[in-house]
Amino acid sequence: ARGHGGHPLKNPSVPTVERMARDLQNLLDHYRLDQAVVVGHSMGALTLWQYLRDFGDSRLAKLIFIDQSPRLVTDVGWPNGICGDFDAARNAAFIDDLETDFAEAVLRLVAFGHNPRARAAYEDDIPAIQNARQRLAALDPRPLIDCWASLTAADYRDVLATITVPALLVYGGASNFYGTGTAHYVRDSIPNALLHVYPDVDHAPHLWERERFARDVLDFLGDGPG
């Protein structure tokens, strides 16, 4: 995604979710793709929902969304955002933390969510956490912080009901950020949606359960065994 490839941006445009959705449209145009199957994980799911808002689904055949809420920020009437408790004030504080120490703020957000293993890994500062800290510290934080502000300003709940193509939803049963209530909300809001919750895996169910995910995708596309 724009601003996330480990290389600096070549132009000053802010990598908002709207800009990333247009990037997807530009990609489809460049390769002359129609009836595409598109997978969006985390920020990618938000980008795909923005794409649907801006461009519709006429060029898409099927959609796959992985472990994401249609609105990240919570309020008194919306408990299905980040950790069920991430209101505007907490988001503003998080953005301040990103400005101060981008890498550590991201690591803490992941660690102090719903997944106790992630918390233990952070508190023990295991090698994987150290490596992640080094990778995050090497990034230019400015475009990523601007991107986050764009993502947390978005609300795609109204988009879900407009989706006319089949959707596969894959959520982690031990997601760092979302409970099953979020998964069920998304499933119930999309007219033709199939939900799989992978038990005991975090925000990246497609990575922890690669073989199952591949089978589920092939079955969803009609290319599975039998």
Range-by-range predicted roles:
Residues 137-188, 197:
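Conserved serine/cysteine hydrolase catalytic core
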Residues 49, 53-54, 58-101:
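Flexible "cap/lid" loop of the alpha/beta hydrolase fold
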Residues 7-13, 74-77, 180-181:
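Conserved catalytic-core motifs of eukaryotic protein kinase domains, centered on the activation segment
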Residues 192-226:
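Catalytic active-site module of serine/aspartate enzymes centered on a nucleophile-bearing elbow/loop
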Residues 1-43, 52-59, 207, 212-218:
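Active-site loop/oxyanion-hole signature of alpha/beta-hydrolase fold enzymes
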Residues 1-3, 69, 201-202:
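Short beta-to-alpha linker loops that shape the active-site pocket of alpha/beta-hydrolase fold enzymes
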Residues 74-81, 96-161:
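Conserved alpha/beta-hydrolase catalytic His-Asp/Glu region
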